[in-house]
């Protein structure tokens, strides 16, 4: 029940993560059409002898409000940190307009939905069972 879907991969062995990540990237590509680069944001960290990778699949890079003009425009182009929950607002006026409802709408536009998540999981399971 989050407003953005995320895959969390963890292992003490980065080679295992690389293997799983490669398969996940392929599964995402079977559901979300790539243009020049894969559509996801990725955060990774190493703590307590454990690697963690968070992958946020994306439908698009920017919501429709980004392309509006004048006072209707909202400069929202979420990167890794934003997708992880720390919202960076490049303009004060946009920050002052943020509400839970608006942020939910913005993230829903750029994030995959539950149906797409389930399709990625289906393709991933097929790859892992080979």
Show where each model-derived region lies.
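Conserved His + Asp/Glu catalytic blocks
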Residues: 1-130
């Amino acid at each position: 029940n989050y407003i953005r879907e995320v895959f969390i991969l963890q292992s003490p062995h980065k080679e295992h993560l690389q293997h799983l990540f490669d398969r996940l990237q392929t599964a995402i590509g079977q559901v979300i059409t790539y243009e020049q680069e894969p559509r996801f944001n990725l955060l990774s960290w190493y703590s307590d002898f454990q690697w963690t990778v968070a992958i946020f699949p994306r439908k698009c890079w920017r919501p429709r409000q980004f392309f509006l003009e004048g006072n209707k425009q909202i400069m929202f182009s979420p990167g890794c940190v934003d997708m992880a929950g720390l919202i960076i607002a490049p303009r004060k006026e946009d920050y002052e307009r943020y509400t839970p409802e608006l942020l939910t709408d913005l993230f829903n536009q750029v994030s995959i939905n539950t149906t797409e998540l389930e399709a990625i999981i289906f393709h991933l399971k097929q790859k892992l069972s080979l």
